[in-house]
């Protein structure tokens, strides 16, 4: 179904010593197809909006992606301040976007940056994350950014409720967010579904800290403020207006423990919570959502 071509170029000591720049070009060609997951649910095309052609011949409508990504990423340090950043521009087309109900051209952006400072055994972090959103879900321009596939260790990573928990969109066959992603992409699944560039986008601000308690034990604390960049796609799909922009505050704590001081055994545990903002309350609930989790990974 899908073919991806990726090219990277790295430049060390770019601009200043200790900073490495990475320039990325990627091409995502995801052909139209019909696919059901192991539980028998339709995931390609995404079961939302216009899916079936009701004209002569019938059948699912062709939803194909032809999108190029161009990115500038970097990591390094300026004296004692650590810097990590990324910017992506996505351009191309979707042959038939189910939300827009038509062919759309893609023009979307993503930006992220993190500054951190090490003091003794603690690293203090501030970061921000942004993806553009679509202000008019039915026109011919798709401005909501979506990735090919992502698993960001950013803004709390797996210790963030928003990042870890897949949140289903009410009354639909898609998710507001998929597990392991910060982007409210409105796609069926990250692994089996297709990218969707008609989505609300997001703005995130983060503060946190990492604690090297012992060489084997590391702790994490994290607070995020989340906000939809646009809400028009949600208002259109849910037949509800207005939906406000604030998603809420996301709190997370956790630890990782490596008994043999290697990656052979990694034990992870934590707790996270999402305190809904006005926009999340408009869609779901005003109750605080909680998550407790733990895992053990063996690598040999």
Named regions from a protein language model:
Residues 51-58, 95-98, 185-193, 235-240, ...:
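Extracytoplasmic loops and strand-loop junctions of Gram-negative outer membrane beta-barrel proteins
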Residues 179-235, 246, 251-253, 282:
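Exposed, low-structure sequence patches enriched in small/polar residues
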Residues 253, 287-300:
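Outer-membrane beta-barrel "beta-signal"
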Residues 144-194, 198:
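Flexible glycine-rich, low-complexity coil/linker segments exposed to the extracellular/periplasmic environment
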Residues 261, 281-286:
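Short proline/glycine-enriched turn/loop segments at secondary-structure junctions
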Residues 246-276:
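C-terminal structured "cap/appendage" subdomains that terminate the fold
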Residues 1-142, 203-207, 212-213, 225-229, ...:
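Signature for the C-terminal beta-barrel architecture of outer-membrane proteins
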């Amino acid at each position: 179904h899908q073919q991806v071509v990726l090219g990277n170029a790295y430049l060390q000591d770019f601009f200043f010593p200790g900073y490495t720049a990475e320039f990325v070009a990627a091409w995502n060609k995801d052909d139209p197809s019909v696919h059901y997951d192991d539980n028998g649910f339709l995931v390609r095309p995404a079961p939302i909006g216009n899916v079936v052609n009701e004209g002569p011949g019938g059948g699912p409508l062709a939803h194909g992606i032809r999108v190029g990504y161009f990115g500038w990423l970097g990591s390094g340090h300026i004296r004692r301040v650590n810097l990590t950043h990324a910017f992506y521009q996505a351009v191309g087309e979707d042959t038939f976007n189910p939300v827009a109900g038509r062919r759309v051209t893609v023009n979307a952006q993503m930006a992220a940056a993190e500054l951190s400072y090490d003091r003794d055994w603690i690293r203090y972090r501030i970061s921000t994350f942004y993806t553009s959103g679509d202000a008019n879900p039915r026109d011919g321009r798709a401005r909501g950014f979506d990735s090919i596939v992502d698993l960001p260790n950013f803004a709390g990573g797996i210790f963030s409720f928003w990042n870890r928990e897949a949140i289903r969109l009410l009354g639909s066959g898609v998710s507001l967010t998929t597990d392991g992603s910060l982007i409210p992409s409105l796609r069926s699944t990250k692994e089996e579904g297709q990218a969707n560039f008609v989505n609300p986008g997001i703005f995130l601000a983060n503060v946190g800290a990492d604690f090297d308690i012992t060489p084997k034990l590391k702790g994490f604390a994290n607070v995020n403020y989340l906000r939809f960049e646009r809400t028009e796609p949600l208002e259109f799909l849910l037949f509800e207006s207005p939906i406000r922009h604030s998603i809420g505050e996301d709190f997370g704590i956790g630890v990782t423990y490596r008994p043999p001081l290697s990656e052979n055994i990694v034990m992870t545990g934590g707790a996270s919570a999402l305190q809904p903002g006005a926009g999340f309350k408009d869609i779901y609930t005003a109750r605080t959502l909680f998550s407790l989790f733990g895992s053990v990974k063996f690598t040999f």
